[in-house]
Amino acid sequence: MHLSEITHPNQLHGLSIRQLQQIARQIRDKHLQTVAEFGGHLGPGLGVVELTLGLYQTLDLDRDKVIWDVGHQAYPHKLITGRYSDFHTLRQKDGIAGYLKRGENKFDHFGAGHASTSISAALGMALARDMNGEKFKAVAVIGDGALTGGMALEAINHAGHLPKTNLLVVLNDNEMSISPNVGAIPRYLNKMRLSPPVQFIKDNFEEQFKHIPFVGESLSPELGRIKEGMKRLAVPKVGAVFEELGFTYMGPVDGHNLEELIATFQQAHQIAGPVLVHVATIKGKGYELAEKDQVGYHAQTPFNLTTGKAIPSNKPKPPAYAKVFSHTLVKLAEQNPKIIGITAAMATGTGLDKLQAKLPNQYIDVGIAEQHAVTLAAGLATEGMRPVAAIYSTFLQRAYDQIIHDVCIQNLPVFFCLDRAGIVGSDGPTHQGMYDIAYLRCIPNIVMMAPKDEAEMQRMVVTGIEHTTGPIAMRFPRGNGYGVPLMEEGWEPLEIGKGEILRNGDDVLIIGYGTMVYPSMQAAEILSEHGIEATVINARFVKPLDTELIVPLAQKIGRVVTLEEGCVMGGFGSAVAEALLDADVVVPVKRIGIPDVLVEHATPDESKAELGLTSRQIAERVLQAYFQKQPSPVS
């Protein structure tokens, strides 16, 4: 059987180990070819090929439900659930998603994109099953990185107190999240993997057993069960933490040995109550370069399969915002030992790996634990440190109560640096940084700013460090800057709550925030071609808003347009409209941003065009709204 013939996971039933191994090779080939051509997550999926096949051969997927944590390791799952022929559309506009979505396929039982949610969801399904008198298996597959998240531990704590609720948790232990794991839980798991008795049994038992005359080969299918029993006798403390929490623990199991996996899962299905199967895998398995560099090959842009190197762009690009941020922060931290960079398992993505390499004592990685990261930063701030919490906009949502309760209510000087703010592209709706303006600006005491380009970002990093009277946040986008000149030192902080006028005109006032400032200027130039002159403001701050600048100009000009790369509801445009109403200035305000929709996966440019956020579309919308002009001249 060829992988392309599999349209239903139950077709794996009855396949021999040899046939499953052939399917595994085909999955890896398709996975590698697709990601090399189009980009995507590489290492996570390569590491769970045998785990997926072994687990699915023991389940009835017409009935049983498997919940994949995060979802970026579920490419093998997609390939055996009827999406082989569409796999070349992965993460592309109108193609299949890079994560799991309930609406995409009947075997995607729970959507995700963020970590640590699978056990809670699977437990909810298991409880509903029992309440409804149904019969199906509920399985959560979670990585050891995601297991460091508090939500996963909360779910384990709950499930362990439900001895009559059948639930299977498969722990995919590859010793990594995106970067190497940190904390006591990964260290405990690693000790179990490396326990000498476990290693001895793993390395020697099977080979010695097969050499027993007459019975060795005939009992080969039972080796998984026998090996599991031997490990539990030899190492009674293996899995003790999970056993104490109410789970039956099995493992560690070789995550690339199909015989052992199938035998273990079959045994696990016979056990009542919550069961945890600990599977040891290798991230990037089957692609040597990814096995050797598990951080670098977690996710890839298009690359050469032979060399592993990214396919170069046709033209040189300016530095990425994250790179400018990290470079500036390191420079400042070298001069100020009180600056402490904090990441929640995203050191490479946020650029804090540069701080770790240069000043390791001024760097903290808390693992996938955004709530802890924020309150840890608050604690550091109480003692005079300058904590810089660099967290993706979409992930900071997970710590909203801590932002309010632990930072803002106490007015502590924590500097939040929100990477990936705005439209992020092919990761889709779970990762779009659309909501931070709305969810932060409503909180008392916090200051919020966004740079128009990478040079202004450098000044905002200084502003955030020097602002010691309360919390402050800076949002910045994924991707590259504009190529404006940068300084190596001597950056001046900005005055809090002050914007700037970039262009003068009498016909319409355009106020841009962050990434929408340059498109504002470009739209103004297009409007000028039609005899309409715009004043353009770079707001810089949404809170406090520069009302001294904005209100008089709005009253004078009489037509206002706001631009933001965030949700319109409660966002920057709403802040401007509220300020004008509070000042009794009644003028029309056209708010342009992301409407009340989920932004699906596509390139950022494709998404912006679909949302009407290109400079030409902005000019068109202004013409239609205020000057009764048809769109054709600027379409």
Curated annotation (Swiss-Prot):
UniProt xrefs under NCBIfam families: dxs, PRK05444.2-2
One Pfam family linked to the record: Transket_pyr
Residues reported in the UniProt entry to bind thiamine diphosphate: H72, G113, H114, A115, G145, A146, N174, Y287, E370
Gene: dxs
Gene Ontology molecular-function annotations: 1-deoxy-D-xylulose-5-phosphate synthase activity; magnesium ion binding; thiamine pyrophosphate binding
Summary of subunit composition and partner proteins: Homodimer.
Reactions catalysed, as given in the entry: D-glyceraldehyde 3-phosphate + pyruvate + H(+) = 1-deoxy-D-xylulose 5-phosphate + CO2
Entry's EC annotation: 2.2.1.7
Similarity annotation: Belongs to the transketolase family. DXPS subfamily.
Entries under InterPro entries matching the protein: Dxylulose-5-P_synthase, THDP-binding, Transketo_C/PFOR_II, Transketolase-like_Pyr-bd, Transketolase_BS, Transketolase_C, Transketolase_CS
Protein name according to UniProt: 1-deoxy-D-xylulose-5-phosphate synthase
Keywords, sorted A to Z: Isoprene biosynthesis, Magnesium, Metal-binding, Thiamine biosynthesis, Thiamine pyrophosphate, Transferase
Source organism: Nostoc sp. (strain PCC 7120 / SAG 25.82 / UTEX 2576)
A GO cellular-component term linked to this record: cytosol
Lineage, opening ranks: Bacteria, Bacillati, Cyanobacteriota, Cyanophyceae, Nostocales
SUPFAM superfamilies from the UniProt entry: Thiamin diphosphate-binding fold (THDP-binding), TK C-terminal domain-like
A biological-process GO annotation: isopentenyl diphosphate biosynthetic process, methylerythritol 4-phosphate pathway
Binding residues for Mg(2+): D144, N174
